[in-house]
């Protein structure tokens, strides 16, 4: 047996990037490019023995990682080794020969290795994307059910196997004593039965939290590993050994082990029962939720201290909602209420559905307040009585101005999308509301949890943390971990077809002729695609045909409906087929859309062929129905505006980015980072693919794309109020106003001092040149239309916004509240 030092030395060397002639990179390219196990003729040379090399490398890493984990426990090195082993086995099964007899065995190994590397969502997706017929052993089937978190299926399968007469101990003993049985077959039956019995114990442990059942399961699997070793049954040695490590890892990270047992102060009576119900309700879901991800564990450990204000910076899809739910559980167990502030109406509706699903089984009511800023009697009643309230800043601000006591018994405020602080009207409103909440005289009695996917690092994050924590010492919760990986590529039109590159390397993996030219139909003479938006739509249809949900990101809201018009037109002309097989799931959304928008509106007409058109200007009732369809996965193609970059959960397997500019200005890396985070759905996709669509100007577009990907980063965070004041002072200085001797008296008494003659002239020129809106030009290839940035706004407009804000700020800072 190797020592810990020997195993560590081996794994350190074996996990070096680029080892064995970049074997894992070549393996990924090999698996991505082939179809049913066969590479295209124009594929680059990837190695004649690549399949054997991948298998040998994968098994070596897996053996070493399990041995080191058994001796020294899980570590960063074992996690890296499991991940690299999983990469190798994934390459062996992805797009492989469907007739290969060992494809099921290798897929089980890939999924288990990903799980042990900390990527349970990728492990789930490895199994979730394939058909049932995998030529697998009963033990592998049981492991598959566990990884898919289908514990009902696991219980049913294990029960049937264990209750089958031929699998009983007496029958097996009789078969061995009779002398006629195939000993290897009998030993396989014993091993598979032991695995099933162990998983029955483990399922009970996950349901009840009883450590004795877990220990029994682990003991059975240790016996199975020894028996398989003695019998030289190599496949079942791997499976039973992996299963032993798998249940050990899952138990270690389970809610039973990670959700604190120590109640918050004052919650000694209610917390134990609520904790049990919380874990049980998550366990009982169709897809059981039984563990915490690496990104969630620190926040969970800090959750019991209800005076510990948290700033949580996790990537998109990394589990921020579960962090908020755990914090809410602690507060509710203390008999205090929870308030969740979401800056977008659509996000409020989405959050309401999520929290109702989690907390309704625990007996707590959930309501959301959004829409117009007024407050109805029903709104006020909900805000005063519901245990969990979700509200937009506008609604909450109006309510608190009417009655400050409405949230006196609220013990937790969750600030969703906490990065939305900046110079826009919505961002300033959010910032001012947060300041108002922090300045309440009872603020110390109320916990604040601030969530975001794109918070900055360094001093800016420290400043935000100090602000939220009112300068109390404490660190933010920060993690770069994502549940799925991502790949950046490009779709390039070549005159007759399009090449899809699956990374940014010119020598990397590609799919040839991913989109082919469509000949002209009827009386038309020109083939399709004819422009960038056509190419994006044809690519979306191709991805959808592969079962990959596709999101087209439009950098401008006014382009979104143009896509809807093109979808309808191309379907009508016969260049695209409907993506819907049955209109029943969308019937209600269609009716609501017809009522509010009319049957011919692009958002309604495109819905009829299975495409969602989403932007913030659509009527709220229709958006609610549309978002419900999206949450159910009923639509394969979505076209969305920048709203999604502000937190709306519209995740997809593929993100198509046809344009990189807005109003002649390139989108910023921080916005792109958040948008790109939408690619790759946990528990659905193994990886997310972000693709720039390039119909023309290929060389320039490719350069711009690489620069944008390289610039993708967290958001720069700075007070919107400070930004506006700084911009006004800069403008006044530029105009020479601040050079006047009595500048401040002049500014206080002369309205014209706050206006720039040059800017006023530009605005007048724009108004004079304004033309009536033309629906035929609302396409990304032809026009720009977007909100002005702070440095583009007229000085007078900035001053008006600051003027309105200052009154609210003074009130927030100085008013006496209860």
Can you say where each PLM-predicted feature lies in the sequence?
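Long, largely alpha-helical accessory region at the distal end of helicase-like NTP-driven motors
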Residues: 705-818
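A short beta-strand element within the Helicase C-terminal
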Residues: 411, 637, 641-661, 688-693
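Conserved C-terminal RecA-like helicase domain
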Residues: 267-290, 294-295, 299, 315-318, ...
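N-terminal accessory nucleic-acid engagement/regulatory domains that precede
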Residues: 1-277, 543-545
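Conserved interdomain linker/interface between the two RecA-like ATPase lobes of SF2 helicase motors
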Residues: 449-564
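Conserved segment of the helicase C-terminal RecA-like domain
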Residues: 661-662, 668-706
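SF2 helicase catalytic motif II
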Residues: 404-444
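Conserved helix/coil segment N-terminal to the catalytic DExD/H
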Residues: 372-411
């Amino acid at each position: 047996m190797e020592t810990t030092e020997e195993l560590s030395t081996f794994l350190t060397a074996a996990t070096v990037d680029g080892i064995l002639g970049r074997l894992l990179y070549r393996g990924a390219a090999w698996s991505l490019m082939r179809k049913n196990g066969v590479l295209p003729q124009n594929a680059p040379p990837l190695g004649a023995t690549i399949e054997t090399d991948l298998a040998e490398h994968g098994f070596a890493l897996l053996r070493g990682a399990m041995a080191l984990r058994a001796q020294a426990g899980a570590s960063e090195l074992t996690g890296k080794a499991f991940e690299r082993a999983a990469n190798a086995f994934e390459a062996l099964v992805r797009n492989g020969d469907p007739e290969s007899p060992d494809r099921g065995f290798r897929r089980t190994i890939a999924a288990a290795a990903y799980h042990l590397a900390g990527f349970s969502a990728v492990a789930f997706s490895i199994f979730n994307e394939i058909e049932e017929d995998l030529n697998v052993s009963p033990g592998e089937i049981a492991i598959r059910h566990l990884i898919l978190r289908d514990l009902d299926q696991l219980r049913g399968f294990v029960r049937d196997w264990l209750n089958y007469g031929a699998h009983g101990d007496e029958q097996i003993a009789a078969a061995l004593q009779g002398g006629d049985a195939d000993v290897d077959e009998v030993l396989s039956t014993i091993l598979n039965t032991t695995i099933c019995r162990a998983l029955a114990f483990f399922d009970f442990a996950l349901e009840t939290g009883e450590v004795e059942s877990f220990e029994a399961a682990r003991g059975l699997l240790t016996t199975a590993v020894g028996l398989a070793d003695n019998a030289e049954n190599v496949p079942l040695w791997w499976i039973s050994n992996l299963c032993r490590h798998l249940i050990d890892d899952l138990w270690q990270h389970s809610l039973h082990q990670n959700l604190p047992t120590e109640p918050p102060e004052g919650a000694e009576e209610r917390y134990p029962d609520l904790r049990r119900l919380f874990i049980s309700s998550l366990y009982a879901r169709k897809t059981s939720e039984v563990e915490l991800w690496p990104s969630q564990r620190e926040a969970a450990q800090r959750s019991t201290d209800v005076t510990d204000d948290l700033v949580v910076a996790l990537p998109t899809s990394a589990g921020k909602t579960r962090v908020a739910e755990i914090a809410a559980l602690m507060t509710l167990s203390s008999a205090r209420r929870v308030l969740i502030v979401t800056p977008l109406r659509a996000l409020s509706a989405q959050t309401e559905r999520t929290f109702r699903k989690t907390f309704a089984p625990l007996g707590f009511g959930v309501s959301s307040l959004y829409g117009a800023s007024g407050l109805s009697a029903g709104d006020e009643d909900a805000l005063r009585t519901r245990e969990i309230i979700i509200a937009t800043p506008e609604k909450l601000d109006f309510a608190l101005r009417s009655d400050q006591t409405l949230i006196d018994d609220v013990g937790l405020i969750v600030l969703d999308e906490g990065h939305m602080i900046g110079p826009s009207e919505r961002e300033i409103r959010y910032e001012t509301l947060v300041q108002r909440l922090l300045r309440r005289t009872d603020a110390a009695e109320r916990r604040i949890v601030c969530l975001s996917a794109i918070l900055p690092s360094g001093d800016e994050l420290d400043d935000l943390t100090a602000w939220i924590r009112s300068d109390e010492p404490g660190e933010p919760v920060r993690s770069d971990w994502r549940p799925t990986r991502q790949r950046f590529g490009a779709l390039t039109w070549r005159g007759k077809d399009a090449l899809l590159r699956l990374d940014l390397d010119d020598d990397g993996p590609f799919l040839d002729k991913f989109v082919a030219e469509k000949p002209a139909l009827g009386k038309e003479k020109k083939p399709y695609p004819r422009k960038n938006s056509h190419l994006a739509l044809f690519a979306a249809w191709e991805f959808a045909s592969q079962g990959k949900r596709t999101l087209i990101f439009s950098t401008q809201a006014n382009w979104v409906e143009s896509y809807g018009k093109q979808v309808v037109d191309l379907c009508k002309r016969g260049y695209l087929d409907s993506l819907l097989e049955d209109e029943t799931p969308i019937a209600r959304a269609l009716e609501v859309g017809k009522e509010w928008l009319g049957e011919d509106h692009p958002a309604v007409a495109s819905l009829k062929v299975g495409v969602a058109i989403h932007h913030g200007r659509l009527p709220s009732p229709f958006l609610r129905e549309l978002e419900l369809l999206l949450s159910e996965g009923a639509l394969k193609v979505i076209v969305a505006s920048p709203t999604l970059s502000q937190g709306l959960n519209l995740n997809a397997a593929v993100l198509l980015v046809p344009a990189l500019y807005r109003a002649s200005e390139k989108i910023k890396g921080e916005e792109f980072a958040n948008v790109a985070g939408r690619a790759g759905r946990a528990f659905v996709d193994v990886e997310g693919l972000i693709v720039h669509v390039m119909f023309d100007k290929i060389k320039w577009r490719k350069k711009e794309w690489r620069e944008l990907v390289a610039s993708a980063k967290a958001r720069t965070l700075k007070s919107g109020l400070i930004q506006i004041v700084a911009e006004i002072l800069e403008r006044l200085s530029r105009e020479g106003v601040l050079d006047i001797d009595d500048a401040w008296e002049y500014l206080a008494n002369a309205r014209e001092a706050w206006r720039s003659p040059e800017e006023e002239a530009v605005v007048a020129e724009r108004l004079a040149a304004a033309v009536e809106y033309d629906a035929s030009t609302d396409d990304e290839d032809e026009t720009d239309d977007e909100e002005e940035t702070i440095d583009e706004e007229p000085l007078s407009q900035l001053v008006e916004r600051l003027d309105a804000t200052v009154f609210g700020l003074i009130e927030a800072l100085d008013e006496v509240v209860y």
